Amino acid sequence: MVSDTDTTTAIAQPDETHDVALTSWLKSANQHPDFPIQNLPMGVFRTHDLPPRCGVAIGDSIVDLAKLAASSPFDGLAGEALSTLTGPTLNPFMQLPPNYASAFRLALSRSLRADSPMEALIRKTLISSHDVEMCLPCSIGDYTDFYTSIHHATAVGKLFRPDNPLLPNYKWLPIGYHGRASSIVVSGQPVYRPNGQVLRPEAIEPVMLPSEKLDYEAELGIFIGSPSPQFSP
């Protein structure tokens, strides 16, 4: 068993799980360009015979957290956190206070390190990353878009107000807007042109057509864990 009795508060700074000297009993994790033991990113995956489930990437494998939870390997906060990771999304885990996530990460890191007594148990939960398909990690109902690039705001403003592109309030308010998010997919999915009504020149009635000009932009999206109370930022 791995206990987290020494991890009871949120960890704001890098801790022992980020130690560059750490190595794992899983050889593919050592010197891995993306998923060494210092990373341990979480996500949701599925296989041809397993439904969507939570996992952690390590080397060329994924730790099946539902299978790991069945053996109750961790005590305290880490164990409680693991119990929220048996479903098809990370939402229940993300709603926990930060110290739960820190405790879980620490316990998992210790179990994956070289000479860990938990090697045999963890090996039974590993699935090759080549045999999985990644899924959306969370159930996404809506989003808040923060307008944070002053260069982008100025460029857009010039289209509408060439002489006054950046309004004064931009530098004083966290400009943001809220909307629904119904078409988010994981990487590698085909992009479909949206359909809309188009009124051709000289036409009297519009027609429904796929978009003939498709623009795109790159944005940074982040997941924020615990929801804020209603009417509070």
Enumerate the predicted regions with their spans.
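Charged, compositionally biased non-catalytic regions
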Residues: 1-15
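Active-site microenvironments in enzyme catalytic cores
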Residues: 12, 17-50, 57, 66-233
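Short edge-strand/loop segments of extracellular domains
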Residues: 62-63
